[in-house]
Amino acid sequence: MRAIEAVVFDIGGVVQESPLDAIARYERDHGLPPNTINRAVVAAGEAGAWARLERGELTVESFLAPFEADCRVHGVEVNGARLMAYIADAGRSRPRMLAAIQRIRERGLRVAALTNNWVAEGRRPTDGLRAHFDVFVESAVVGLRKPDPRIYELVCRELGVAPSRVAFLDDIGRNLKAARELGMATIKVEDPDQALRELSALLGFDLID
């Protein structure tokens, strides 16, 4: 078994509740078929408003109109401000994940956050979490977003650890695929407790009491 020297956590959907759940609630509340918004975001691609928001090229305020236009092109009417309010309301931290992060650091391993995020009125939705991590890499700050391989290389450089010695937790398959291709061990977070059990097995010590 390889020796893991650092663990990298996604934020939304891993350390915090998933923004995808908030988007699904918005769709239910507004009579949209499931996954409609995500399909529009994916179809808009790297030139779309969502990708530009996560690279820090737009703030939330300047993102709303082009995002609504992207959705409209794909036949979806979305109130961008209301959707972002749903996402903001869902940004609650998962206490078990924070406790696991503390335990990992107490064992002498380095811990990083690697998040696709954005800036809203000068604030970032992750501002309250930074003290829990040795390294905090944000897409809106570095101008790269997952699954661009360069952002994984960046977090490994910041940690001072080779990718082959890093474990990465994320809730989105394409983000994990890019990390695996660089040699990282990956864990998909669908059930947080199960993910922590898998990470415990990888590290060789318990993260859940």
What do these predicted regions represent?
Residues 110-112:
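Structured, non-catalytic alpha/beta "coupling" segments that mediate domain-domain communication
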Residues 1-5, 9, 102, 114, ...:
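Asp-based, Mg2+/Mn2+-dependent phosphohydrolase catalytic module
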Residues 107-108, 132:
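Structured helix-beta-strand junction loops
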Residues 2-99, 106-107, 118:
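N-terminal helical cap/lid subdomain that shapes the substrate entry/recognition surface
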